[in-house]
């Protein structure tokens, strides 16, 4: 068996906190209980000692709500989500709200790749490409879920050889943890029995004003990146690495997200806004380094 990857993502909430004991959730657990592909779906709650609270469903291992305090100590749900499981299953509009993405995040051109001389055809769900794992990616399966304690959930999913066209039996183990340092930590670990490709990620949509409270255009973003990867008209990277200097892609100095989103710039037209990868500046190849900051 091949140990593919161990990935850890951190989100630090730096705000004034006051301890809260009652649930902040605005959704009902029973509205998230159904059966999908013979497996039960449910809703889980994570909390830390500072009052941060997160609700999660095992359908797609999705974050449904995430309550954090603003600078004045007022708690708001800062992720976009639905109030029942049916809206996730029979989605209209955005499919990936709060979800785990796999086997492969982002687009694979024409849904094709070659590995060790073998050609693989994936399911097409973003014509002409395969996006975020295909027609039935990890966002549309029920994960086996174990509540470790009040602030930690453990998920497991076994993806069969050939699922959505990908080679290898793949076992994915994932942990969501809400720490007392106000970090949301996502840990991925995957093991395969065959050479394959994999790119796991998390897909929450954040709004620091609170879900439903306007846009993020006035959120001030800093990206520690001198370059980005331009895309073609179907959002496949061209292979180039372009400087952000003098373009709307330059967030090295903190800038409101919406300041230049409507600029006459071809990359923004292709993406209908920002839908790109930035190449992060790094001092070393290992360890954590500052990637980005955002505040309202």
Locate predicted features:
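An exposed, glycine/acidic-rich loop-and-rim segment of catalytic or binding clefts
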Residues: 18-54, 58-296
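C-terminal motif of bacterial Sec signal peptides marking the signal peptidase cleavage site
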Residues: 14-16
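Sec-dependent signal peptide recognition
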Residues: 2-8
